[in-house]
């Protein structure tokens, strides 16, 4: 199920956008693991399970100030995930299979402000994301991590059709049970581009993570 609403006032350069989405999966597959006392081994069987669903919502607003050279925008979002799976705890004949549920609520907000004229643009931005992660059967996995960042960007357009743009942001992670993930990263990117052939061709030189501070970390929360 999805719902969209968008509107834009060209005269005021003001726009609103919103989006709500809900999805649920019927008869998902989860592996059931049962101990066989006769053989001393385990039997793993795929079984249907219900309870996997996700809800997402976002709201965005952007507008120019009266002189049209300054703009501000805001982007808010919320996401809730409910995951289920069969989980076996215990050893041997004492093993018990139960239905486990993990939930993850994430709230986010991003703000931007910018100034621009014919040849120069400068912007400031900040964002925060906060999560509540819960595991019903293994509460030691529960945590409430959050990330926040703040930075600036600029772009200069030169008369000979050359453009220099750069952005820098300090990104921070906190609240993780794994202390190695709680860190600060200063990320700096830059790009130089030249347009020629009457605007029909462009050559760009781009540099990402110039300070070599960014780490590639991906996390997933499952019920199994």
Predicted regions and their residues:
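Exposed, low-structure sequence patches enriched in small/polar residues
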Residues: 1-224
């Amino acid at each position: 199920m999805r719902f969209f609403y968008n509107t834009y006032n060209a005269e005021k350069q003001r726009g609103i956008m919103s989006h709500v989405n809900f999805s649920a999966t019927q008869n998902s597959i989860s592996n059931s693991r049962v101990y066989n006392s006769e053989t001393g081994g385990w039997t793993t069987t795929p079984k249907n399970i219900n309870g996997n669903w996700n809800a997402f919502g976002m709201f965005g607003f952007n507008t120019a100030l009266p002189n049209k050279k300054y703009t501000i925008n805001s982007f808010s979002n919320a996401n809730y995930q409910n995951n289920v799976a069969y989980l076996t705890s215990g050893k041997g004949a004492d093993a018990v299979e139960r239905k486990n549920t993990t939930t993850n609520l994430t709230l986010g907000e991003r703000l931007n402000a910018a100034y621009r004229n014919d040849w120069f643009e400068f912007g400031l931005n900040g964002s925060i994301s906060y999560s509540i992660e819960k595991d019903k059967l293994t509460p030691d996995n529960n945590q409430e991590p959050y990330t926040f960042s703040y930075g600036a960007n600029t772009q200069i357009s030169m008369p000979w059709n050359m453009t220099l743009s750069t952005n820098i942001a300090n990104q921070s992670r906190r609240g993780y049970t794994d202390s190695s993930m709680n860190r600060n990263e200063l990320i700096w990117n830059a790009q130089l581009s030249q347009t020629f052939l009457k605007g029909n061709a462009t050559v760009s030189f781009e540099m990402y993570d110039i300070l070599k501070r960014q780490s590639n970390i991906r996390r997933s929360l499952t019920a199994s």
